[in-house]
Regions:
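Hydrophobic alpha-helical segments
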Residues: 1-167
Length: 167
């Protein structure tokens, strides 16, 4: 490739990426079952706002562009503060999150980064003041569920369309 052909290639707009595979179409029964878990979680007492914060943080950790975009948009549509959304990547360093959110985000990180270290007893104990046993199970299912979605969307290259967010 010559310098001039390289420059012209870089100047062209890139085509929208295509998914490697449409997992929803290939295995609709599995997709439906996974979506059913999310529907149940949205009916839980955890609250959609907390779920979406957890979904966003786990998606950031896993590097799933599709899911980060989707959960950012969902939080904005539900009135979440932009500063809290932008700061979730550094949640331990800021005081924008209450004790319940901090415990959930910590648990989400520990349960997502299992290859680094498993959740410790102190991480579990930090949940107790904020969550019932049922809610702890629901939270852990939510973390597992978003990890599945991240692997599906990142693994099969779910495309992210450029859609500016209007604030």
């Amino acid at each position: 490739m010559t310098a001039s052909s390289s420059a012209s290639t870089c100047a062209r707009p890139l085509a929208a990426p295509m998914p490697r595979l449409n997992f929803q179409a290939v295995a609709p029964e599995l997709y439906k079952a996974q979506a059913g878990i999310n529907a149940l979680l949205h009916e839980s007492s955890l609250g959609i706002q907390l779920l979406e914060l957890v979904f966003l943080r786990v998606s950031q950790i896993n590097g799933c562009a599709f899911c980060v975009d989707m959960h950012t948009r969902e939080l904005l549509s539900r009135g979440e503060d932009l500063q809290r959304i932008n700061s979730i990547v550094t949640w331990p360093e800021v005081d924008f999150y209450d004790g319940r959110e901090r415990a959930a985000l910590n648990w989400a990180e520990r349960c997502t980064r299992l290859s680094q270290a498993h959740p410790e007893q102190q991480d579990f104990e930090a949940l107790r003041p904020h969550f019932s046993e049922r809610e702890m199970v629901e939270l852990t299912y939510a973390i597992g569920s978003i990890n599945v979605w991240n692997r599906l969307c990142a693994g099969f290259a779910a495309p992210v369309a450029r859609k500016p967010i209007k604030l």
